[in-house]
């Protein structure tokens, strides 16, 4: 996004990297396979990095204690770099992005099971080789399954479509063998760059467990301290804490705060995030305009 913004004529005051320190040994282990299987993606990434470099955008590593400052609106951002030096930078916009996390809420709402990926620090839906979830007939592809880029999403969607065609009797696996082989091969190629991406952008889990005064649920104005106190009441499970604090009940329906809440509860009770899971979510999964709701003409559409 930074490279695209620069190409469009925008200006960037700085890029703050909050992820875990990069293991260059791991980079050297994953880079050859990524170059061999996905040279186009690697080249595209290098071009974008070059764009950022030649536009003289300052990049800070191992950043901590990011604070948005201003009176009524954002005026500046303060942070501490890897040397412990505190910086104050004037800015009108602050964009925050932590990790590469699939959108699991639709699967979760449908009753599908999730699994915790310790390497990528996120929950993912449990799927078979075709993308079918633990709910029979519910297929998941693209960024709802795992973040792998546009090419991976395309081929995972194609595999799901082929499996559906077989399930409804439109074709058998033998007749579709060539297409199945093609899309599986292309999907594996596209995903071969993922270990490198994970190594370079690994989420620091403590970033999701900040100080008490940090806002976790912006929709309902719930900070980390409120969640920690609620965690000590009752079972301390995500659904109960959601009910106690209204975390995840706002417009975003937990898309921003569900994982941080589970991480906070895990650290408070010294339990694993995988054991706690995420709180239940309700539709709509994204803000719905009144006009969009009114345009539903049939009762079946509304259901």
Indicate residue ranges for each PLM-predicted region:
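Residues forming the flavin
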Residues: 1-245, 251, 255-264, 268-302
């Amino acid at each position: 996004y930074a490279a695209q913004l620069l190409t469009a004529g925008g200006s960037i005051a700085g890029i703050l990297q909050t992820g875990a320190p990069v293991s260059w040994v791991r980079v050297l282990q994953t880079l050859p396979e990524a170059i061999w299987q996905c040279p186009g993606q690697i080249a595209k990434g290098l071009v974008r990095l070059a764009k950022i470099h030649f536009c003289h955008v300052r990049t800070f590593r191992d950043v901590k204690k990011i604070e948005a400052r201003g009176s009524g609106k954002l005026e500046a951002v303060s942070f501490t770099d890897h040397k412990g030096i505190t910086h104050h930078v004037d800015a009108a916009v602050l964009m925050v992005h932590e990790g590469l996390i699939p959108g699991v809420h639709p699967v979760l709402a449908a009753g599908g099971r999730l699994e915790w990926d310790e390497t990528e620090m996120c929950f993912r839906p449990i799927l078979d080789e075709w993308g079918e979830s633990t709910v029979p007939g519910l297929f998941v592809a693209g960024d709802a399954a795992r973040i792998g880029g546009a090419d991976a999403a395309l081929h995972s969607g194609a595999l799901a479509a082929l499996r559906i065609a077989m399930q409804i009797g439109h074709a058998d696996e033998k007749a579709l063998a060539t297409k199945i082989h093609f899309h599986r091969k292309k999907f594996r190629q596209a995903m071969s760059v993922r270990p490198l991406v994970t190594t370079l952008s690994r989420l620091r889990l403590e970033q999701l467990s900040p100080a008490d005064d940090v806002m976790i649920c912006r929709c309902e104005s719930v900070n980390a301290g409120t969640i920690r106190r609620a965690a000590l009441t009752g079972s301390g499970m995500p659904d109960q804490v959601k009910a106690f604090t209204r975390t995840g009940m706002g417009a975003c329906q937990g898309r921003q705060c569900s994982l941080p809440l589970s991480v906070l509860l895990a650290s408070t009770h010294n339990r694993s995030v995988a054991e706690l899971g995420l709180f239940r979510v309700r539709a709509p999964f994204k803000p719905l305009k009144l006009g969009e709701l009114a345009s539903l003409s049939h009762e079946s559409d509304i259901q």
